[in-house]
Amino acid sequence: MPVGFLGDPLIRLRAIAVAHPDHPLHKLGRKLSHRDLRAHRHLVVRESGTQRTTRALTVEATQRWTVSHLATSVQAARMGYGFAWYPEDAIRDELAQGTLKPLRLREGEVRFAELYLIIAERDDPGPGTLRLARIIREAVKSECPKEMTTAA
C-alpha cells in the first residue's frame, strides 16, 4: 500500500514456490535452502508500480529473468527455465496437469500478498468513485473464491 494511504483489504493471494517437475531443484531430493535457490534462475514478473520496491515474491539469485506478464513467466517455468512463486489460483491447471510442481523449501514455501481498495479522497469521494468501489467489491465477492476474499 502506498505510504500515506489507507485502504480496505479485498483479496489475500497465496503464492507458492514452483518449478517444472524435471528442474534440478526437484532432483536434490530434500528441502531446499535459500542458497539452493540462489544457484538457479529465478523468474520474476516486473512490477507495474512507479517505485517498484516490493520484494514479496522474489529472492536474490545469481540469475534472474524479469518478464512483463505472469503468463510469460508461467510458460518459462513450464519449459524448465527457472523457478518462481506464483499465486496458487493462477497456476491451478498447471499443478493439476503436473507441468509445474511445488518446491519443498525449508522456509518461505508459501507467501502471501494482499490486494487493497484505496480511495485517495476518502473524506469526500465523488459518486463515480463510490460506484466504482461498490462494483469492485461486488466483483470480488462474486468472482473470487471465498477463502481469498478479505472484504466485509
Predicted segments, located by residue:
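C-terminal regulatory
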Residues: 2-81, 86-111, 130, 134, ...
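A bilobed periplasmic-binding-protein/Venus flytrap-type ligand-binding module shared by bacterial periplasmic
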Residues: 18-22, 114-125
